[in-house]
């Protein structure tokens, strides 16, 4: 039982005994005692002044005396104005540590068959280019969010919608057809997504050259864009694709398959995956159908040019296009189609979309539309909106080929981690295979942690060099501390020390040890908070705080050299439980922790 729960129950009993009043649990407010005061937990007594009919200090004094006499968890108390600071007994902290120790997955709540089903969409790549730094933030946030939502007792389905059709895909296809000379991933030794991305860049270069030529002949930019033969060919290819032209469809399938093989490799390296992948080419027709259904029911209206719109002025928004006059769909139509397929596949209770903040308006509209069309989760859909990510050099663009590819970034992170680890002697005495594995764990851990520690809503600059520092709020610092604890546990085992299932009470704990148990115990509340706020950064920053506190403890106290055997065993057990919570916390973020370094 949590210490707070015990104290709340005792305070309720005390108020009844002292003042003859029953109070609800929510009226009893406990918080961590501020660092400048003595104690662990503080009770705010102001809500009880009416019933005590006394001043705040006297009321606090009376409640404190009652708790000291009747609640074994309270060892001492002091009163500062209307605040009652409670010092918790050492035996109670050891009891709490035993509870944590007995649960291998402390702080995580298992789902049952009847738990709510939450679907989380993330990644959403286009099949005309490789994944880039923006996708890295999206994938890492989506994967961590899925883990956190699952750790709060929900069933989770991780899903991806692949944008595999449209004019941007036709640009890569046309460029390959015109300039590719039959190149394949096999013939070039390139990953398929990178090869197709090269042709997207190639289209853009040829198109720009064409525009420059037409403008030299006296055309305006708009006229040149309308007259561009290359763009006309791309549009014709899209029309043929929509009409199911066998040659265009065969080229589309071949190039998309190259891209999927490349994506799979990137996802595998990144450590993310999906339970179900949807493709826009399968969903856009479903969306059209649903829009026509809404038109018949009078939810939507048609303009003279045949386009279909929805009027959202009553909801404080404007008119929104759902189908163009020529019958082609827009993103909104496709999202409606995808929702229809998903709802047919799964009994969704909640849908979370992990999409950048430039789409905030889109999801406001989508929520209203899905609700109008009868999707039960429409109104409550969650747009997990996140900010842009940049490198210190500035923004990224993919049309000009100056984008930061996810593959290159991950490779650079692993090689930098290897160099840094070697310089600091972290790889000494390891085989080549072990050293490579640690470089991978540290490099990817640095990347993931640096991105996930930032509040998702904020724009951020990813600094590769800063992220691989073994000191400060970084992945490698946390990983190194975990490896350090594993080394302590190995040495303890080698010297024949066995951690008992129950650590016996009877030892006096220092303030630092009590604080560390309190921090480890907080993990359960942190996981809950991260789930309620949809915030991986809460887990990341808590894990850093825990590791920072443990490192101070490690420097200030003897563990293996402690002479008192009972204290030594307690400190080893405390270390093991810190390591467990670090492993669980980093696991929720999708980050591995090495057992040696």
Curated annotation (Swiss-Prot):
The keyword Transcription does not apply. It is an enzyme of class 6 (ligase). The keyword RNA-binding does not apply. Keywords: Aminoacyl-tRNA synthetase, ATP-binding, Cytoplasm, Ligase, Nucleotide-binding, Protein biosynthesis. It is found in: Cytoplasm. It catalyses: tRNA(Arg) + L-arginine + ATP = L-arginyl-tRNA(Arg) + AMP + diphosphate. Its EC number is 6.1.1.19. A motif ('HIGH' region) lies at residues 125-135. Gene3D superfamilies: Arginyl tRNA synthetase N-terminal domain (3.30.1360.70), HUPs (3.40.50.620), Isoleucyl-tRNA Synthetase, Domain 1 (1.10.730.10). Its main location: cytoplasm. One of its GO terms (cellular component) is cytoplasm. GO terms for molecular function: arginine-tRNA ligase activity; ATP binding. One of its GO terms (biological process) is arginyl-tRNA aminoacylation. InterPro entries: aa-tRNA-synth_I_CS, Arg-tRNA-ligase, Arg-tRNA-synth_N, Arg-tRNA-synth_N_sf, ArgRS_core, DALR_anticod-bd, Rossmann-like_a/b/a_fold, tRNAsynth_Ia_anticodon-bd. Belongs to the class-I aminoacyl-tRNA synthetase family. Monomer. NCBIfam families: argS. This is Arginine--tRNA ligase. It comes from Bacteroides thetaiotaomicron (strain ATCC 29148 / DSM 2079 / JCM 5827 / CCUG 10774 / NCTC 10582 / VPI-5482 / E50).
């Amino acid at each position: 039982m949590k210490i707070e729960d015990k104290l709340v129950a005792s305070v309720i009993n005390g108020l009844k005994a002292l003042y003859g009043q029953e109070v609800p649990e929510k009226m009893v407010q406990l918080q961590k005692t501020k660092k400048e005061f003595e104690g662990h937990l503080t009770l705010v007594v102001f809500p009880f002044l009416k019933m005590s009919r006394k001043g705040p200090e006297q009321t606090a004094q009376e409640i404190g005396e009652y708790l000291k006499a009747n609640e074994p968890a309270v060892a001492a108390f002091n009163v500062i104005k209307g605040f009652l600071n409670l010092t918790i007994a050492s035996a109670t902290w050891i009891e709490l540590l035993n509870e944590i120790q007995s649960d291998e997955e402390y702080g995580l709540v298992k789902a049952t068959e009847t738990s709510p089903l939450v679907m989380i969409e993330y990644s959403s790549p286009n099949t005309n280019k490789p994944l880039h730094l923006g996708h890295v933030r999206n994938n890492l946030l989506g994967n961590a969010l899925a883990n956190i939502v699952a750790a709060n007792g929900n069933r989770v389905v991780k899903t991806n919608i692949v944008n595999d059709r449209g004019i941007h895909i036709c640009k890569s296809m046309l460029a390959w057809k015109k300039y590719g000379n039959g190149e394949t991933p096999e013939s070039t030794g390139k990953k398929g997504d990178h090869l197709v991305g090269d042709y997207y860049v190639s289209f853009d270069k040829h198109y720009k050259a064409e525009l420059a030529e037409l403008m030299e002949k006296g055309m305006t930019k708009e006229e040149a864009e309308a007259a561009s033969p290359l763009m006309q060919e791309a549009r014709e290819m899209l029309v043929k694709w929509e009409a199911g032209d066998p040659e265009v469809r065969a080229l589309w399938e071949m190039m998309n398959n190259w891209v999927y093989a490349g994506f799979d490799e990137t996802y595998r390296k990144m450590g993310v995956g999906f339970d179900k992948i949807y493709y826009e080419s399968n969903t856009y027709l479903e969306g059209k159908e649903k829009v026509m259904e809404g038109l018949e029911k009078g939810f939507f209206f048609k303009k003279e040019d045949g386009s279909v719109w929805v009027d959202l002025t009553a909801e404080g928004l404007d008119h929104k296009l759902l189908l163009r006059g020529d019958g082609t769909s827009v993103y909104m139509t496709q999202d409606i189609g995808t929702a229809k397929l998903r709802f047919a596949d799964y009994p969704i209770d909640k849908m979370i979309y992990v999409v950048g903040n430039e789409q905030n308006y889109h999801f406001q509209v989508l929520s209203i539309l899905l609700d109008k069309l009868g999707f039960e989760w429409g109104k409550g859909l969650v747009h997990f909106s996140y900010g842009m990510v940049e490198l210190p050099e500035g923004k990224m663009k993919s049309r000009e080929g100056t984008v930061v590819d996810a593959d290159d970034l991950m490779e650079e992170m692993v090689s930098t981690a290897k160099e840094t680890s070697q310089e600091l002697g972290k790889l000494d005495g390891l085989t080549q295979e072990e050293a490579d594995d640690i470089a991978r764990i540290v490099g990817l851990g640095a990347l993931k942690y640096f991105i996930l520690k930032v509040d998702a809503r904020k724009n951020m600059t990813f600094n590769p060099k800063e992220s691989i520092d073994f000191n400060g709020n970084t992945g490698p610092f946390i990983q190194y501390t975990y490896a350090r604890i594993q080394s302590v546990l190995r040495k303890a085992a080698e010297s024949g020390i066995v951690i008992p299932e129950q650590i016996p009470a009877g030892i006096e704990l220092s303030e630092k040890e009590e604080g560390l148990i309190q921090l480890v115990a907080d993990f359960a509340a942190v996981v809950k908070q991260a789930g309620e706020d949809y915030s991986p950064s809460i887990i990341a920053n808590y894990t850093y705080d825990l590791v920072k506190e443990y490192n101070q403890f490690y420097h200030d106290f003897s563990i293996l050299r402690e002479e008192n055997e009972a204290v030594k065993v307690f400190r080893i057990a405390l270390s093991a439980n810190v390591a467990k919570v670090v492993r669980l916390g980093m696991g929720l973020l999708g980050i591995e922790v090495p057992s040696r370094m």
